[in-house]
UniProtKB/Swiss-Prot annotation:
Forms a complex composed of PxpA, PxpB and PxpC. The keyword Hydrolase applies. PANTHER family: 5-OXOPROLINASE SUBUNIT A (PTHR30292:SF0), UNCHARACTERIZED PROTEIN YBGL-RELATED (PTHR30292). This is 5-oxoprolinase subunit A. CDD domains: LamB_YcsF_like. Belongs to the LamB/PxpA family. HAMAP family: PxpA (MF_00691). One of its GO terms (molecular function) is 5-oxoprolinase (ATP-hydrolyzing) activity. It comes from Mycolicibacterium paratuberculosis (strain ATCC BAA-968 / K-10). The keyword Ribonucleoprotein does not apply.
């Protein structure tokens, strides 16, 4: 049976403020990209999410970001490479401790938001993130965009790279994501998204916003936990894949 990983961004609340339905998403996905406190998340909330993930057998990944709570990590920061390296090391280490206390472990790293998009093409920041992962644990896979500078830097350091596609985001013809500031960047119809994901998994391709066919390498599919209707979208994707004989399983 064919298999694919489903991942979602979780643990992104802060204090009394909650974002998304982490418990419901943990019943659907196979991997949880857990915030590390720099773009979202507080220690108590992160411990709660990691405990719930451990109970459900969901893999935990460190979702590292720029130090940007106010902007939710969605703003580019021109940070020096050595500072970014230290920030990423710190975030992975913090979540490793929390996951360990919860009876789980961090088994991969995924950059978040603006950092994710920046290191597709930014050599210095891509190298800093890859080197930070290597310094913490060279056995940790990194989740990201195929063909990115980040993947080149990670592979150069012997890190395993895991290519992901986005269930609910529109793609540009060059393979990058359409900016959230643009109309149609975030998709919302659960049934249409589910069919789109099945096509991605079956054919290794997706239709870009200009109608052209875009080849994709897909080992994991991200469903954003903070999108409107996230639980309904994730459920539709899971159910459609299962109906087509595709097993939902973690990559690590």
């Amino acid at each position: 049976m064919a298999g694919i990983d489903l991942n979602a961004d979780l643990g992104e609340g802060f204090g009394v403020w909650r974002l998304g339905d982490d418990d419901a998403m943990l019943g659907i996905v196979s991997s949880a990209n857990v915030a590390c406190g720099f773009h979202a998340g507080d220690p108590a909330g992160l411990l709660r999410v990691c405990r719930s993930a451990a109970e459900r057998g969901v893999r935990v990944g460190a979702q590292v970001s720029y130090r940007d709570l106010a902007g939710f990590g969605r703003r580019f920061i021109d940070v020096a490479a050595d500072e970014l390296l230290a920030d990423v090391v710190y975030q992975i280490g913090a979540l490793q401790a929390i996951a360990h206390a919860a009876g789980s472990s961090v088994c991969y790293v995924k950059p978040h938001g603006a950092l994710y998009n920046t290191i597709v093409t930014h050599p210095a920041q891509a190298a800093a993130v890859a080197e930070a992962v290597r310094l913490v644990d060279p056995g940790l896979p990194v989740l990201g965009m195929a063909g990115s500078v980040f993947f080149d830097e990670a592979a150069r350091r012997g890190l395993r790279v895991v290519a992901e596609a986005f269930a609910d985001r529109a793609y540009r013809p060059d393979g990058r994501l359409v900016s959230r500031r643009e109309p149609g960047a975030v998709l919302a119809d659960p049934a249409a998204i589910a069919e789109r994901v099945l096509a991605m998994v079956d054919t290794g391709a997706v239709t870009a916003v200009n109608g052209t066919r875009l080849e994709l390498s897909v080992e994991s599919v991200c469903v954003h936990g903070d999108s409107p209707g996230a639980v309904q979208i994730a459920t539709a994707v899971r159910d459609r894949l299962r109906a087509a004989g595709v097993e939902i399983r973690a990559f690590c």
